[in-house]
Amino acid sequence: MKRLFRIMSLTVLLCIGFGGVNAQTSNQGLSNKSKVTMGKNNAKVTAILKAVELYAEAGRKGSSEIGKQAFTEQATMSWVENGKITTVPISALYDGLEQTGQEEVTYEVLDVNIAGNVAFVRIDSWFSKLGSFNDMFTLAEQNGEWKIVNKIYSVK
């Protein structure tokens, strides 16, 4: 069943809607202002957002090795420039991470949409050296681990 979660702000509280149980997590990008009713999808959302946090951490550290933990080997990155859609292998992102080096990175999770073993996440991100972006990720669950299959972005 397809579930849509709207998540607004930066840092910590996830609520399980069934049974009134609250669960704390330390996912970057979520806040106690988030109104998330996850029920049995709590573990999925946490695992999905782990991949997004690895992406952000790769930016913070300028590390392609950390980035590789977030993406599948066949992942792609896309954007529109001058009206033309460009898609490149994710290795282009890794090269950019290494060239840019360490920087401050923050993000806000806006949407998490799960359908079985695939998911979509939309974030607003800010990189101190590169600027602000609208990032959208398509993820798939592989061997119990969520990996980013595609990143598409626009510059804010």
Name each model-derived stretch.
Residues 1-30:
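Bacterial Sec-dependent N-terminal signal peptides
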Residues 23-61, 69, 73:
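Short, low-complexity N-terminal intrinsically disordered segments enriched in polar/charged residues
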Residues 47, 80, 87-131:
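Surface-exposed, charged secondary-structure patches
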Residues 55, 67, 75, 121, ...:
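Hydrophobic pocket/interface hotspot
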Residues 70-76, 83-84:
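Acidic helix-start/capping segments at beta-turn-to-alpha-helix junctions
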Residues 71, 81, 113, 124-127, ...:
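A mature extracytoplasmic/lumenal domain signature
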Residues 73, 117, 144-145:
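Beta-strand-connecting loop/turn residues
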